């Protein structure tokens, strides 16, 4: 009989591969320890990390113990799985700083939403204690080079004439496999989850844990989240969408989810939110009957912004959205303009008086030519009024301090006139 958790994950389309689904069903009939690893590649997580993080919460909410592993050791090397080129190696100081940042971020994000804390570990804590000879003897002897080079994630690199793979990256699978064996020893961990690109590493960890510990453990991977057009979900024109509000404001985060396509939004509600599949089906049915006024994008944006940034972050995002999209910008008070800046609307301070230069400085145009094209295409507004190509100039600043620049429907920048 399928456990309610596993049935829910299947209904949501959240299981890509499993080492033994029937055995996992049996395993999850009792409380278990489950882990997922996060390598530090920057000082913040991004939305690509949300599905595995949310997956850990789903397990913990179902009565299991979640473990989030930060790869202080593996992050020094970098996972080569399905990467086209060799990763750049970062210094120990940089990686250590990122480890602290991610650990704090995960704890702040997750623990207040859980009835008991998630366990946080750093694989550098045990990898530092192993010398290289012992590692090769005790771990390396269990790995077949033939098997490793035939894994699809490695084979793609080896088949490229312009790219090989260094021994450093090639050894990554051994380190991740050892993590599984170590967590099994320390915490009795018997299930690892990860992205589908981690399948080869997870299988290696299952095998090593069996050989070293005599324990049967299991793995489960999550699907690669793609949009209906086949492209990878999670980035914008400006790059990654970060969970750190200083890198991606709650407003920009909210707008990202609000922009989900109709063909994608119901899948995303299943992947990312804790709304039941029945509730999501009801939302979809209501949207189909609403004649072009769907509510799904707003619900998705609200749920995700609340999850990552809390009620306060959601309120600020909705406040900006209401101000920018529902009325005349010139009706905003000075206090409301200042609040937009505090709430995270893209903002700059400038003494520049030329509109074309300001469009470049604000990031709304990449060059003078592009700025002029936007103006010619009637895509630029200043303080809520379209700019004429015949007279591309700045209007008087609101309250003698602010210009609100807009490109198209969704791109804004608040410019404060420098004193």
From Swiss-Prot:
Give GO cellular component annotations, separated by semicolons.
cytosol
Residues annotated for ATP binding in this entry: 235
Question: Main localization of the protein?
Answer: cytoplasm
Name the Enzyme Commission number(s) assigned to this protein: 6.1.1.1
Biological-process GO terms, alphabetical: tyrosyl-tRNA aminoacylation
GO molecular function per UniProt: ATP binding; RNA binding; tyrosine-tRNA ligase activity
Residue interval(s) of motif 'KMSKS' region: 232-236
Q: Which PROSITE patterns match?
A: AA_TRNA_LIGASE_I (PS00178), S4 (PS50889)
Q: Where in the cell is it found?
A: Cytoplasm
**Which keywords does this Swiss-Prot/TrEMBL entry list?**
Aminoacyl-tRNA synthetase, ATP-binding, Cytoplasm, Ligase, Nucleotide-binding, Protein biosynthesis, RNA-binding
- Which PANTHER family does the record associate with it? TYROSINE--TRNA LIGASE, MITOCHONDRIAL (PTHR11766:SF0), TYROSYL-TRNA SYNTHETASE (PTHR11766)
Family assignment? Belongs to the class-I aminoacyl-tRNA synthetase family. TyrS type 1 subfamily.
Q: Summarize the subunit comment.
A: Homodimer.
> Under which name does UniProt file this protein?
Tyrosine--tRNA ligase 1
Organism of this sequence = Vibrio parahaemolyticus serotype O3:K6 (strain RIMD 2210633)
């Amino acid at each position: 009989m399928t456990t309610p958790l596993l049935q829910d994950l299947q209904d949501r389309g959240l299981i890509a591969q499993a080492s033994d689904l029937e055995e996992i069903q049996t395993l999850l009939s009792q409380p278990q320890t489950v882990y997922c690893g996060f390598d530090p590649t920057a000082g913040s997580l991004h939305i690509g990390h949300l599905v595995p993080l949310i997956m850990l919460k789903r397990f913990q909410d179902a009565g299991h113990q979640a473990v989030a592993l930060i790869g202080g050791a593996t992050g020094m090397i970098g996972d080569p799985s399905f990467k086209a080129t060799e990763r750049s190696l970062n210094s120990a100081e940089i990686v250590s700083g990122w480890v602290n940042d991610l650990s704090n971020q995960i704890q702040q994000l997750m623990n207040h939403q859980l009835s008991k804390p998630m366990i946080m570990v750093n694989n550098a804590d045990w990898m530092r204690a192993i010398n290289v000879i012992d590692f090769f003897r005790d771990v390396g002897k269990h790995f077949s080079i033939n098997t490793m080079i035939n894994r699809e994630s490695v084979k793609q690199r080896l088949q490229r004439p312009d790219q090989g793979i260094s021994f450093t990256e090639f050894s990554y699978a051994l380190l991740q496999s050892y993590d599984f064996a170590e967590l099994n020893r320390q915490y009795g961990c018997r299930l690892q989850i990860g992205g589908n690109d981690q399948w080869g590493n997870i299988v290696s960890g299952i095998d090593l844990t069996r050989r070293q510990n005599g324990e049967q453990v299991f793995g489960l991977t999550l699907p690669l989240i793609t949009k209906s057009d086949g492209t990878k979900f999670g980035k914008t024109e400006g790059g990654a969408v970060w969970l750190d509000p200083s890198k991606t404001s709650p407003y920009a985060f909210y707008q990202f989810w609000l922009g989900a396509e109709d063909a994608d939004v119901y899948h995303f509600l299943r992947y990312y939110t804790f709304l039941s599949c029945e509730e999501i089906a009801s939302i979809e049915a209501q949207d189909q009957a609403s004649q072009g006024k769907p509510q799904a994008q707003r619900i998705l944006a609200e749920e995700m912004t609340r999850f990552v940034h809390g009620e306060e972050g959601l309120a600020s995002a909705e406040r900006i959205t209401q101000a920018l999209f529902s009325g005349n910008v010139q009706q905003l008070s000075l206090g409301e303009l200042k609040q937009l800046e505090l709430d995270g609307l893209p903002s700059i301070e400038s003494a520049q008086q030329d509109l074309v230069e300001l469009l470049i400085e604000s990031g709304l145009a990449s060059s003078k030519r592009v700025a002029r094209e936007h103006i010619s295409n009637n895509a630029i507004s200043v303080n809520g009024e379209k700019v004429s190509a015949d007279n591309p100039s700045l209007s008087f600043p609101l309250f003698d301090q602010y210009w609100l620049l807009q490109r198209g429907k969704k791109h804004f920048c608040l410019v404060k006139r420098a004193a």
